[in-house]
């Protein structure tokens, strides 16, 4: 699957450094799994793990383009209870196709009495399934043009202000 990519595949983990104590140990596991995909992709897979709080432009892109938002997590201490807003999502993007895996897609919570155990679901399966969906959902311009019955004609309307200097002076345009 990763060996036949015609475009770069982006796997970006949005993980907050300040998060729920039960999620914190999972962040290195997610980063390690992404690195495995990067190695298997042999240059066609780009992986990133970012804390959106440190990168406001990536946070804005995540919120506006992909609907990724911080989730409120309740932290209960011995004498106090607090709520922390944290990111725990993975973006899978290939060409114009994208899928977001949010924390309910990534973790499994097992409660027994007063304690809870949080672990990653089968992240390799979930990531591979998402990659397969975006890769097979994407059609490159080459493949779209190859399916046309007749040659395509492209008409471009450009004002001289947006042309390179060499072409702007040409009166033939």
Say what each PLM segment does.
Residues 1-173:
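Short, surface-exposed patches at the edges or C-terminal ends of soluble domains, predominantly
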């Amino acid at each position: 699957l990763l060996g036949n990519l015609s475009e770069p595949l982006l796997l970006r983990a949005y993980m907050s450094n300040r998060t729920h104590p039960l999620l914190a140990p999972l962040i290195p596991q997610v980063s390690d799994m992404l690195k495995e995909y990067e190695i298997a992709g042999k240059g066609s897979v780009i992986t990133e793990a970012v804390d959106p709080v440190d990168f406001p432009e990536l946070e804005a892109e995540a919120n506006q383009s992909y609907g990724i938002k911080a989730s409120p997590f309740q932290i209960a201490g011995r004498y106090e209870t607090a709520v922390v807003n944290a990111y725990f999502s993975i973006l899978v993007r290939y060409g114009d196709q994208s899928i977001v895996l949010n924390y309910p897609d990534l973790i499994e919570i097992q409660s027994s009495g007063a304690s809870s155990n949080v672990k990653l679901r089968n992240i390799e399966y979930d990531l591979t399934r998402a990659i397969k969906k975006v890769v097979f959902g994407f059609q490159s311009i080459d493949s779209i043009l190859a399916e046309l019955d007749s040659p395509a004609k492209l008409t471009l309307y450009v004002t001289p202000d947006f042309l390179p200097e060499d072409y702007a002076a040409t009166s033939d345009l």
